């Protein structure tokens, strides 16, 4: 069954493979946001997705995605970048959320930049 306890246990057992980006690499991070039902009868654990804006020339235009974006110089970590971007994009503060961990760093395609995935 998919719930935050299952995800928490999997993340605790996971040691993510990290990529050490070069100085010119632009990093990005996303937040995978889970919400447990308030009661057992209320349903199942939910995961939040957004629909990306439609823009000509954007290969991911209009697709479903996790909230997130590029890391700025003011972001102290990739987690901070994911939190800031989530608030900017959908107005949801993750300041009081339980941080469960990071997934393996992934190379974004086709641009070849490092995309670091976070779960919050």
Name what the model sees in each region:
Residues 1-66, 70-120:
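N-terminal leader/linker segments that precede catalytic domains of diphosphate-processing enzymes
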